Amino acid sequence: MDLTEAEDMKKRWQEYTEGLYEKGLNDPDNHDGAIIHLEPDILECKLKWALGSMTMNKASEGDGIPAELFQILKDDAVKVLHSICQQIWKTHQWPQDWKRSVFIPIPKKGNAKGSSNYCTIVLISHTSKVTLKILQARLRQYMNRELPDVQAGFRKSRGTRDQIANIRWIIEKAREFQKNIYFCFIDYAKAFDCMGHNKLWKILQEVRIPDHLTCLLRNLQTGQEATVRTGHGTTDWFQIGKGVRQGCILSPCLFNLYAEYIMRNAGLDEAQAGIKIARRNIHNLRYSDDTILMEESEEEQKSLLMKVKEESEKGALKLSIQNTKIMASGSITSWQIDGKQ
């Protein structure tokens, strides 16, 4: 491969990834910057806990510091990191190296010539993960307060097996009582990459996340930079204008809150929706962005799906119509959404 072709490949990857994360024109910045209540300082014992939970033998990026170094330095590492974390906590400003990510594209099955047919793994600074772990622990208490039982994504003692078991049980009971049931398996197109930042800050405010934590999250997302590492070298650095950070442990928490806001606005918290089980109406099961809608009639299922679609688009999330599927125990007609069947 000649130099010109290699440079063209890098340029194409940069254009594709930069376009994917380009800030939307309908996502204006409306933050007033006021912080009234400060969260308690970070304790050294919490820092030791965060260091102890880190996974070893992982590739390092950004500052180039491997996780194993913290094990070697022990208390010396705790003192230095505690000073850095405290400074971030009080000033709400993150080191720029901690806001940089390296994308490595991995081809999926099928045609490997199209950039959209790749998934990416992302390398971020190991040092930043210590502060992120502490911030995640602070966020989790608020997340557990806001999220319903039907959301099992990235939550302690819950998982996909629980949701699969729930679906099997619902189907068995529907057969036992000879009731029709309609499932809609929703698939979003690049859900984590499309979230509007300022929409996210508004949602965090509405669910009463402390301003201090929201400011830390906002400043982490603002000014993000990324590069794509290809087989022909790395691209220039470019700005990330939307979506949550890939490879960041905070991203699933933030997406769950974002998705919960959408589902509430779609009316999924209404008592009359869904199917009735043990005096309770169940209308959806979720694992992060993977959502199943449930109804006892086809018309109600269509209506619920259109509400979710409409509210999702208000939040810059688009349904992948091609990958959204319907499963029914009774008769069903052909559905068309946006001209697609």
What role is predicted for each listed range?
Residues 9, 13, 62, 66, ...:
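Hydrophobic (often cysteine-bearing) scaffold residues that line and stabilize catalytic clefts
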Residues 19-28, 57-62, 79, 91-97, ...:
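Short helix-interrupting loop/turn segments at helix-coil junctions
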Residues 34, 232, 318-341:
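Short, conserved micro-motifs composed of acidic
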Residues 44-53, 80-88, 134-138, 163-175, ...:
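Inter-domain linker/hinge segments that demarcate the starts of reverse transcriptase
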Residues 188-288, 295-304, 324-328:
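Conserved polymerase palm-domain catalytic core
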